[in-house]
């Protein structure tokens, strides 16, 4: 269940009486990471699923667990908060009760750190930024013409969904 004020009583009753060893739900439990550095503190106590051998749940974007409760995390990047975190698809074997995590190789966010003291951007491979939301973080820009040529390439040689320049 997704527990909310309209179904809270019914959901708790279901969690307490279900004839099951495994719970699969969309839960908001305290102590787990919602995002990489943000731990939930205003949800439900995890004891509401303590009677289950294993609880597999969603809702939080970051994959994390305590050995009994498994947050699968988002399967793909949705926001910049997901950037840099490996995302997974999962297979649950109902006979062995093993949960297999399969890495998702695809991402939609990318950062490009610009430092023209270290890199010649006229020769820089921009293909990894194709079909991405890109943050261009400018650390050192002494060659304005090369910077402009890089921007021109990003806008016209590949497709970027969005380009944010942080100077």
Predicted regions and their residues:
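Active-site-adjacent helix-turn-beta-strand microarchitecture at beta-sheet edges
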Residues: 54-57, 65-121
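His/Asp/Glu-rich metal-coordinating catalytic cores
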Residues: 1-70
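Short beta->alpha connector loops
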Residues: 2-7, 75, 117-119, 141-143
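Short flexible/disordered coil segments
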Residues: 2-5, 87-90, 163
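Surface-exposed beta-strand edges and their flanking turn/coil or helix-capping segments
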Residues: 10-14, 36-38, 83-86, 112-117, ...
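Short, low-complexity, polar/charged sequence segments that are solvent-exposed and flexible
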Residues: 16-19, 41-45, 74-75, 88-91, ...
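Short gly/pro-enriched beta-turn/loop segments at secondary-structure junctions
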Residues: 18, 50, 84-87, 94, ...
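Accessory, non-catalytic peripheral segments of nucleic-acid enzymes
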Residues: 94-167
């Amino acid at each position: 269940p997704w527990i909310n004020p309209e179904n809270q009583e019914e959901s708790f009753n279901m969690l307490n009486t279900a004839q099951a060893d495994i719970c699969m739900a969309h839960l908001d439990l305290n102590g787990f990471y919602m995002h990489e550095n943000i731990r939930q503190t205003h949800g439900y106590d995890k004891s509401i699923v303590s009677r289950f051998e294993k609880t597999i749940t969603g809702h939080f974007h970051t994959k994390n667990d305590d050995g009994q409760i498994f947050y699968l995390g988002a399967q793909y990047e949705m926001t910049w908060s997901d950037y840099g975190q490996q995302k997974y698809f999962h297979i649950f074997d109902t006979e062995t009760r093993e949960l297999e995590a399969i890495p998702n190789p695809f991402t939609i966010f990318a950062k490009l750190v610009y430092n023209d003291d270290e890199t010649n951007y006229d020769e820089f491979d921009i293909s990894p930024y194709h079909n991405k939301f890109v943050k261009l973080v400018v650390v050192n820009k002494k060659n304005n013409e090369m910077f402009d040529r890089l921007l021109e390439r990003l806008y016209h040689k590949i497709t970027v969904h969005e380009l944010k320049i942080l100077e």
